[in-house]
Amino acid sequence: MRTNRLSWILVLSVVIFLVIINTINASDDEERLMVDVFRGYNSLIQPVRNSSELPLIVKMALQLVLLINVDEKDQVMHTNVWLTLQWHDFQMKWNPVNYGEIKQIRVSPDKVWLPDIVLFNNADGNYEVSFMCNVVINHKGDMLWVPPAIYKSSCIIDVEFFPFDEQVCTLVFGSWTYNENEIKLEFVQAELVDVSEYSASSIWDVIDVPASLVNKRSRIEFQVRIRRKTLFYTVVLIIPTVLMAFLSMAVFFLPTDSGEKITLTISVLLSIVVFLLLVSKILPPTSSTIPLMAKYLLLTFVLNVITILVTVIIINVYFRGPRTHRMPQWVRVVFLQFLPKLVCMKRPKSASERSAVRSGMAQLPGVGQFTLSPSAHHPLCPSADDRTTTIRNTASNETSAYYPLSTDALRAIDAIEYITEHLKRDEQHKSFRDDWKYVAMIIDRLLLYVFFGITVGGTCGILFSAPHVFQRIDQQEMLDRLKEKYDTASNIP
């Protein structure tokens, strides 16, 4: 039993010893390889034997990891990417057999020559990568460097269809000191941006990611085509603005004598000003085009200002009277006869018209039999017709023996005549005022229809003029399609 235990301990010790020996040998081989490879190596010299090997081919790829932010006001795109750079260094070659079958090594980037590929259109002054990772070198002299980077690149923002806008932002890479005769750029695989590790943004959808070589293959342009997700702006900006546009028409429903017409229009106007300030803070102050949302807010603002002016005119018309204004005949024809039929309004009958109807009803058969005859009146209480005749006769002959009246009675009759004339005049003035009020009501109803048509037409014409209003994008499906496109292009020789 004790012999078996000692045997296991001996075997385990031998295995551990061999592992340590192999590790030491591997470390020795790699250290020896590093010494041999970098003996006489100068990292400042471009890795070409002579000028006949120029230009040096540098292969490049870009992998989009995260779209951090797109600042519309400052016109800057903030991205997290992985760069891939490949080139050949003839000095970095060795035979793996001589170095323990080591086929690749990793070295610090300051030990080898690196192509000075920088982002040309950076927006923060940081041209280089943010983390200097190791360079992977294989035994054939092929160099691979995959540094991560966070870039802020300039991006010209097209705000014409905001918030239904698409943007095309470009990242331009190239050598800072070498010209097109010294370095040529190529793609590692496909002429696309790799989105296999991309994390979807909550604000933007990635539509396409093409790439191209420009300036005699001395630069590479990677394009990121993105489309804004509109749910947030629809709820926060578009729907309230549309509701305010239609709310401004409610002023034509309010009675003019309520005194709230101007209050409502001013309140809506102030709300529109607040939304205009909100849009101006989001978008860049460009003069090349007017944003879609700004156009709609401007239309609503202008309509509201016109509503205020028209409301003032309507209030002025509503409170006109016969002592200050006389209604022209054309106004009476247009606003009291023609337009009521056009806007489907019917004027209620006045008190005098209702009296005329009642008096007409008195002439119907069977109604006149209840009318008292003049002979039914008491001699001292004559009928209205007899009273008129009596008054006239009394004026010419005060000693009429037929109907003798006292002086007080004559004064009372004069007072009644004065009151009657005054009531008739008031009724006539009231009729004139009612005509002006009805004209104001007609203008209210007509402008309600006109402004409703303009608001509906403006809303549909402006908001629906964007080319992608009703298009919904499945971001995951789009990314899968771009990945498949990238893999297909990579497999093409």
Curated annotation (Swiss-Prot):
It holds the Pfam family Neur_chan_LBD. It is a multi-pass membrane protein. PROSITE patterns: NEUROTR_ION_CHANNEL. GO terms for cellular component: acetylcholine-gated channel complex; neuron projection; neuronal cell body; plasma membrane; postsynaptic membrane; synapse. Disruption phenotype: RNAi-mediated knockdown causes a resistance to nicotine-mediated paralysis and small impairment in mobility. SUPFAM superfamilies: Neurotransmitter-gated ion-channel transmembrane pore, Nicotinic receptor ligand binding domain-like. InterPro entries: Neur_chan_lig-bd (IPR006202), Neur_chan_lig-bd_sf (IPR036734), Neur_channel (IPR006201), Neuro-gated_channel_TM_sf (IPR036719), Neuro_actylchol_rec (IPR038050), Neurotrans-gated_channel_TM (IPR006029), Neurotransmitter_ion_chnl_CS (IPR018000), Nicotinic_acetylcholine_rcpt (IPR002394). The chain crosses the membrane at residues 233-254, 262-280, 296-317, 446-466. Residues 1-26 form the signal peptide. Glycans are attached at residues 25, 50. GO terms for molecular function: acetylcholine-gated monoatomic cation-selective channel activity; excitatory extracellular ligand-gated monoatomic ion channel activity; transmembrane signaling receptor activity; transmitter-gated monoatomic ion channel activity involved in regulation of postsynaptic membrane potential. Residues 27-232 are extracellular. Keywords: Cell membrane, Disulfide bond, Glycoprotein, Ion channel, Ion transport, Ligand-gated ion channel, Membrane, Postsynaptic cell membrane, Receptor, Signal, Synapse, Transmembrane, Transmembrane helix, Transport. It is found in: Postsynaptic cell membrane; Cell membrane. Disulfide bonds join 155-169. GO terms for biological process: chemical synaptic transmission; locomotion; monoatomic ion transmembrane transport; neuromuscular synaptic transmission; positive regulation of acetylcholine secretion, neurotransmission; positive regulation of locomotion involved in locomotory behavior; regulation of egg-laying behavior; regulation of membrane potential. Non-alpha subunit of nicotinic acetylcholine receptor (nAChR). Involved in nAChR sensitivity to nicotine and levasimole. Interacts with lev-1. Component of nicotinic acetylcholine receptor composed of 2 non-alpha subunits lev-1 and unc-29, and 3 alpha subunits unc-38, unc-63 and lev-8. Interacts with oig-4. Interacts with crld-1. Belongs to the ligand-gated ion channel (TC 1.A.9) family. Acetylcholine receptor (TC 1.A.9.1) subfamily. This is Acetylcholine receptor subunit beta-type unc-29. It comes from Caenorhabditis elegans. The lineage of its organism: Eukaryota, Metazoa, Ecdysozoa, Nematoda, Chromadorea.
